[in-house]
UniProtKB/Swiss-Prot annotation:
Catalytic activity of the protein: L-methionyl-[protein] + [thioredoxin]-disulfide + H2O = L-methionyl-(R)-S-oxide-[protein] + [thioredoxin]-dithiol
Similarity section: Belongs to the MsrB Met sulfoxide reductase family.
PROSITE patterns: MSRB
Keywords: Metal-binding, Oxidoreductase, Zinc
A Gene Ontology term for the protein's cellular component: cytoplasm
Enzyme Commission number(s) of this protein: 1.8.4.12
GO molecular function: peptide-methionine (R)-S-oxide reductase activity; zinc ion binding
Record domain MsrB: where: 17-139
Entry protein name: Peptide methionine sulfoxide reductase MsrB
GO terms classed as biological process: protein repair; response to oxidative stress
Length: 139
């Protein structure tokens, strides 16, 4: 989805904050660029059960497959694993008085959500992801 003013470096998408603001909705910008969190149970994909591939709303990077999605009851779309491990980055997050693992898009560094070690098999992980960070490409 890069436009003429978008730079890519080693598969990274680099845009100015002005470009991001123009291209993303206000909630997408807040989540992806400012690390905001949607209110629980408010996101577009929380109860969406269509088959497909979830890509980054900022850059189109493939992130999760619908067959890895499960209902965790936490209020955000949850997945057991990324579609491609190298398409997500994880960083330690000590904001808000908590210690968590933040999940970011490896291509555009957009904030996606957090991963927790309380999910079902096969991984035991729960990738708790903001709907605003995702775009579903139905199969």
């Amino acid at each position: 989805m890069p436009d003429a003013k978008t730079k890519t470096t080693d598969d990274k998408v680099i845009k100015s904050e002005e470009q991001w603001r123009r291209e993303l909705s206000p909630i997408q910008y807040a989540v992806l660029r400012e690390k905001a969190t949607e209110r629980p149970f408010s996101g577009e994909y929380e109860h969406d059960h269509r088959a497909g591939t979830y890509v980054c709303a900022g850059c189109g990077n493939v992130l999760f497959e619908s067959d890895a999605k499960f209902d965790s009851g936490c209020g955000w779309p949850s997945f057991t694993q990324p579609a491609v491990e190298s398409h997500v980055d994880e960083e330690r997050d000590v904001s808000h008085g908590m210690i968590r693992t933040e999940v970011l898009c490896a291509k555009c560094s957009g904030h996606l959500g957090h991963v927790f070690p309380d999910g079902p098999g096969p991984t035991g992980l729960r990738y708790c992801i903001n709907s605003a960070a995702l775009k579903l490409e139905p199969k």
